[in-house]
Amino acid sequence: MRRSEVLAEESIVCLQKALNHLREIWELIGIPEDQRLQRTEVVKKHIKELLDMMIAEEESLKERLIKSISVCQKELNTLCSELHVEPFQEEGETTILQLEKDLRTQVELMRKQKKERKQELKLLQEQDQELCEILCMPHYDIDSASVPSLEELNQFRQHVTTLRETKASRREEFVSIKRQIILCMEALDHTPDTSFERDVVCEDEDAFCLSLENIATLQKLLRQLEMQKSQNEAVCEGLRTQIRELWDRLQIPEEEREAVATIMSGSKAKVRKALQLEVDRLEELKMQNMKKVIEAIRVELVQYWDQCFYSQEQRQAFAPFCAEDYTESLLQLHDAEIVRLKNYYEVHKELFEGVQKWEETWRLFLEFERKASDPNRFTNRGGNLLKEEKQRAKLQKMLPKLEEELKARIELWEQEHSKAFMVNGQKFMEYVAEQWEMHRLEKERAKQERQLKNKKQTETEMLYGSAPRTPSKRRGLAPNTPGKARKLNTTTMSNATANSSIRPIFGGTVYHSPVSRLPPSGSKPVAASTCSGKKTPRTGRHGANKENLELNGSILSGGYPGSAPLQRNFSINSVASTYSEFAKDPSLSDSSTVGLQRELSKASKSDATSGILNSTNIQS
């Protein structure tokens, strides 16, 4: 049993006791029955009114709860609709009081969410408005009267974040462009003269509208200023170039040049003005020194002609070059020609540089070719001979590659310009072919000269004898082996040798001219055959080394037809007798023969012990 039911029974018991107590009191007092009835009726009435009042109050409470439930349910549905959430559903059976409480709690929660969303929406709208005003962009389209959903709020947040990033990037770009604009204005000595320029340079950076239009206008302004700066720099550089040319033409002293060194850098307006004043001064000075200037221009013209590989006909086509009436019109013609040549060279600079590279490579190749044919290259070479050969081989490979590359580029140029590219009045490949042909002819001519020289030298040796220089070191005597030793009859020289040539005085082996040997039958001697174009092995060795061309002494050997045939070697006795005759002649004995005397003295001692050496007899 519920406690409320127990309390109700207790209330009934209390009421019964109270009525019984009233009856007892009435009996003791002696109240008649009719009055008891009235009094009981009053008690009943009071009790009933009290209970009715209590019941009415509880019924009122019930009605209020039911009404509250209805109101909360209605408001909750509205909030769920505004907040875009599912409607509230009560789980299971519940009392009116609990239902009202649950609905009221849910309504309060929904109201709180609605308030938070409205506050966040308001904050985002304020940020969006501020950013859009700075960026000059339209506001975010959202209904501020309705409650935004979570998705709508998330999108709004992302939009505001994007606006912040856009603002940061545009601000960075604005600051960078502004800095460059200020530098350009300072370089140009330019002061802001429009409202936009003043807003950019003078106003606060945070107050500047970072719209796309303003950024584009900023970029345009920067391009204009940079173009003005570039033009100003180009003008100043042109004025400086003009000043240097005028200095060189007028031969201005270095002291005077250093006086204006401060304006030879920079491109500000005051620098440009000072440069123009200097040019005007030099131009006036140029007019006063017309002849000197024109001659300087002519020197420069020749340099450009050389760089452009002009032929003699092309150079002669400029008739004013030889004129001697030094007037202003002549100077203008020369200036115009210089400008034309400069432009022509700059347009075709790559081709001219390629041809110049080929020319330099060709000259270097010819130099190595000359060194390769020089007999002196074998003396005092210091290890350079191999390097030169490698470089010459490298150049031989490089030249055809350069020629092919230039040929392709020149053909492309000729197709574009519909005219021939000339080098010294010829097409480039014709010029190259001519250079190779001239080189081949020069080599052929040199070869023929060497052959003719060798032929003449051989004929001279046949008539007068040869005297190759012996090495500084004496070769050791070969062992006298039975297989190689030849027994030679050695005789002393007869008096007939007095008819022969003068004996050698500077040392070395004596080679007499070959003569025909008399036949055993005593018939006439056979005439010696003349030397053909081929070199003998001795002659080849003689021409291959410079040392063989430089004689330590002079040899005049006897070569008349009646002399006996001479062999290649002399006996020690023959050499010794020759030296004894040489020593008797006071006109030939001098300090230069001291070394020879020592050598012959050693040879005489060696002859006494070594027996017969490889030698030849000189017969009368």
Curated annotation (Swiss-Prot):
Residues 606-620 have a biased composition (Polar residues). Keywords: Cell cycle, Cell division, Chromosome, Coiled coil, Cytoplasm, Cytoskeleton, Microtubule, Nucleus, Oncogene, Phosphoprotein. Phosphorylation by CDK1 in early mitosis holds PRC1 in an inactive monomeric state, during the metaphase to anaphase transition, PRC1 is dephosphorylated, promoting interaction with KIF4A, which then translocates PRC1 along mitotic spindles to the plus ends of antiparallel interdigitating microtubules. Dephosphorylation also promotes MT-bundling activity by allowing dimerization. Phosphorylation by CDK1 prevents PLK1-binding: upon degradation of CDK1 at anaphase and dephosphorylation, it is then phosphorylated by PLK1, leading to cytokinesis. This is Protein regulator of cytokinesis 1. Residues 446-488, 517-545, 600-620 are annotated as: Disordered. Residues 1-303 are annotated as: Required for the interaction with KIF4A. Residues 96-133, 211-304, 383-463 form a coiled coil. Changing T470A: No effect. Abolishes CDK1-mediated phosphorylation, leading to prematurely recruit PLK1 to the spindle during prometaphase and blocking mitotic progression. Belongs to the MAP65/ASE1 family. Residues 1-341 are annotated as: Dimerization. The modification Phosphothreonine is found at T470, T481, T578, T616. Residues 446-459 have a biased composition (Basic and acidic residues). The modification Phosphoserine is found at S513, S571. Residues 342-466 are annotated as: Spectrin-fold. It is found in: Nucleus; Cytoplasm; Cytoplasm, Cytoskeleton, Spindle pole; Midbody. Microtubule binding occurs via a basic patch in the central spectrin-like domain and also requires the unstructured C-terminal domain. One of its GO terms (cellular component) is contractile ring. It comes from Homo sapiens.
